[in-house]
């Protein structure tokens, strides 16, 4: 199973101090150094989200990681003309289409692929024409998986936030939803990834309950752990946990 490391919150920390002076010589922490550390720790890919409001990752961050880090790059992005143009300039290995709300702290739910199907189709076609694979970040619901299949998405990322944020019976119900969605996607020939809220504590339950997972995209818990053990070691611990449990 592959581990994609999301390094957005390295940029979040940097922006807390240097948002208005990114050209300063002493800006820290370095997004590029975090990507290198993730690579040394065993990451299989780097994920970053360039949001429309540029609240954390900047265009220059994505471009520097793409140019310098020898790992596949996954760009999370909203389906806007601006971001489509940027993705075509960046040429990541793949993109993950996500919803965006300016008032949210982080992405709060999956993209409604059913509602936005007509808007997504031309974007996905443009990306395919440029050799960029497209994933859709969706809630684990049958209609969403079916919409992804109609759009010809080669992969999806199941939103695991509800699983992560609940316990007891509600978490069991979320696991069942994830399992059904993963099984359906697999039967339709769609690669199944997962992300949002996955941490060192809930990883075992997720992997035991959801089949056919190909890649996990994990960020906040790794960056949080890195505050105490360093980025490379935090990634290594997650890599070892995935290898042990999968």
Curated annotation (Swiss-Prot):
Pfam families xref list: PdxJ
Gene3D superfamilies: Aldolase class I (3.20.20.70)
Localization (cell): Cytoplasm
Sequence positions that bind 3-amino-2-oxopropyl phosphate: 6, 17, 197, 219-220
EC top class named in words: transferase
E.C. number(s) listed in UniProt: 2.6.99.2
Site (Transition state stabilizer): 157
Reactions this protein catalyses: 3-amino-2-oxopropyl phosphate + 1-deoxy-D-xylulose 5-phosphate = pyridoxine 5'-phosphate + phosphate + 2 H2O + H(+)
One term of GO molecular function: pyridoxine 5'-phosphate synthase activity
GO cellular component terms given for this protein: cytosol
Keyword Cytoplasm appears in the UniProt entry: yes
Record bears the keyword Oxidoreductase: no
Binding-site list for 1-deoxy-D-xylulose 5-phosphate: 8-9, 51, 56, 106
Active site: 49 (proton acceptor), 76 (proton acceptor), 196 (proton donor)
CDD domains for this protein: PNPsynthase
Known partners and oligomeric status: Homooctamer; tetramer of dimers.
UniProt-recorded name of the protein: Pyridoxine 5'-phosphate synthase
Natural source organism: Akkermansia muciniphila (strain ATCC BAA-835 / DSM 22959 / JCM 33894 / BCRC 81048 / CCUG 64013 / CIP 107961 / Muc)
Lineage summary: Bacteria, Pseudomonadati, Verrucomicrobiota, Verrucomicrobiia, Verrucomicrobiales
The gene coding this protein: pdxJ
